[in-house]
Each structure stands twice: as structure tokens, then as C-alpha cells.
């Protein structure tokens, strides 16, 4: 989960979560710009939107559902010029971004 849908640093406590965490909004923008990482994230996010009749909990399980929401919140902020990640939040979380991720991002501005 961590290397497909990474979260902002400071949320997860496991070694894998810490290893794959994104340090800042600037790093999230760089992640999106990377030819492999950005493309993979977009492809996987799009695939979740193609699942019919399932909730995020059905797809990922309870813990990873929270990680997915957190990741989509981070990349919604980082990709202000595209709506893919917001569509995931809209579809699976009734438009409600992850408050813990938003708190970590508070005060960070996009460089793009």
C-alpha cells in the first residue's frame, strides 16, 4: 500500500510507512512529476474509480482504506490542476478529505 499510495510523513508509525512517506507538498509534486511513480499512482487511482459496487473498505480493508484516503488527500493538494484524486475522495469518502493529512499540510504551499 505504502509504495503505491504514499502518505504525508508523520501519520504512519510502521517502518514501511516511514520509509515510503512523502516529506512535503513539494515532494508530492515531484512524485507526481516522476515518469514511473506519478504514472503508477494515477493508473492505480483510476483503477479504483473503475470498481463498481464496492466501498474503499471493501477494496482495501479498514486500515488501508484510511491510508488511501490520506494519500488521495495529499495528491489532491499536490495536483491542483487535475481532479483524479479528488474524484477518488468524492466517490469513496463523500468528498471529505482526510483531516489528519490536511493538518500536516497546513502552512505548506504548492510550488507550481
Task: Describe the predicted segments one by one.
Residues 1-25:
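Hydrophobic/aromatic-rich, well-ordered segments within soluble, folded domains that form packed cores
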Residues 30-79:
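Mid-chain, well-packed structural core segment of small domains
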Residues 78-112:
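Charged phosphate-binding loop/patch that engages nucleotide di/tri-phosphates or the phosphate backbone
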Residues 7, 44, 91:
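Short acidic/histidine-centered micro-motifs embedded in hydrophobic/aromatic stretches
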Residues 14, 34, 82-83:
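Serine-centered coil/turn micro-motif
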Amino acid at each position: 500500500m505504502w509504495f503505491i499510495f504514499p502518505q504525508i510523513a508523520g501519520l504512519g508509525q510502521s517502518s514501511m510507512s516511514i520509509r515510503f512517506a512523502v516529506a512535503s507538498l513539494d515532494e508530492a509534486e515531484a512524485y507526481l512529476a516522476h515518469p514511473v511513480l506519478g504514472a503508477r499512482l494515477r493508473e492505480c487511482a483510476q483503477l479504483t474509480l473503475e470498481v463498481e459496487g464496492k466501498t474503499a473498505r471493501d477494496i482495501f480493508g479498514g486500515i488501508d482504506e484510511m491510508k488511501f484516503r490520506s494519500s488521495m488527500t495529499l495528491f489532491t493538494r499536490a495536483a491542483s490542476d487535475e481532479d483524479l484524486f479528488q474524484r477518488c475522495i468524492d466517490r469513496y469518502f463523500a468528498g471529505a478529505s482526510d483531516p489528519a493529512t490536511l493538518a500536516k499540510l497546513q502552512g505548506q504551499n504548492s510550488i507550481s
